[in-house]
Amino acid sequence: MPNAAGRFGRLGWLWLSVLVLVIDQVSKLHFESSLSMYQQIVVIPDYFSWTLAYNTGAAFSFLADGSGWQRWLFALIAIAVSAVLVVWLKRLGRNETWLAIALALVLGGALGNLYDRIALGHVIDFILVHWQNRWYFPAFNFADSAITVGAVMLALDMFKSKKTGEAVHD
């Protein structure tokens, strides 16, 4: 009879997804209640500010000017991706910790933005990186950061050395 760790793969890493989801939602609640739309609070002059922005589209406001159908399209995509990530986590081996962390980060971020999209009709963004008043990166949130870190980890995982045909993940 297989033990629980073998049967459930790396699903124990779902705690990290839940942590990302909680931090994301608490931070969004804080900034939404503290700032008015597009207000900026400078943290590091010329480089970093807090702000409040709503994004009805995807990354970089892709399709944000749609009539509302994009809300449900992006929600369905997030649900499908989340299901794939859970199955992938379940199938990971004991030695694939790096990959488990990456997947858990992406999953937590996807769920954080999915909640916003379904419950609010938009995603709350509050982190603004800029250079003086000349260049602004699109506003983003904690969930976006977790997705980005997880995606970079997944990309780096593809380049790890291989031993006996298996990727080394720890």
Curated annotation (Swiss-Prot):
Compartments, record wording: Cell inner membrane
Domain of life from the UniProt record: Bacteria
Pathway field: Protein modification; lipoprotein biosynthesis (signal peptide cleavage)
Pfam families recorded: Peptidase_A8
GO cellular component: plasma membrane
Record membrane topology: Multi-pass membrane protein
Catalytic activity, as annotated: Release of signal peptides from bacterial membrane prolipoproteins. Hydrolyzes -Xaa-Yaa-Zaa-|-(S,diacylglyceryl)Cys-, in which Xaa is hydrophobic (preferably Leu), and Yaa (Ala or Ser) and Zaa (Gly or Ala) have small, neutral side chains
Transmembrane segments: 11-31, 41-61, 69-89, 95-115, 136-156
Residues at the catalytic site: 125, 144
Keyword Hydrolase: yes
Keyword annotations from UniProtKB, A to Z: Aspartyl protease, Cell inner membrane, Cell membrane, Hydrolase, Membrane, Protease, Transmembrane, Transmembrane helix
Keyword Ribonucleoprotein in annotation: no
InterPro entries membership: Peptidase_A8 (IPR001872)
EC assignment: 3.4.23.36
GO molecular function terms listed in the Swiss-Prot or TrEMBL record: aspartic-type endopeptidase activity
Biological process, per Gene Ontology: proteolysis
HAMAP family reported in the protein's UniProt record: LspA
Function description: This protein specifically catalyzes the removal of signal peptides from prolipoproteins.
Family: Belongs to the peptidase A8 family.
Protein name: Lipoprotein signal peptidase
Organism: Pseudomonas fluorescens (strain ATCC BAA-477 / NRRL B-23932 / Pf-5)
Source taxonomy: Bacteria, Pseudomonadati, Pseudomonadota, Gammaproteobacteria, Pseudomonadales
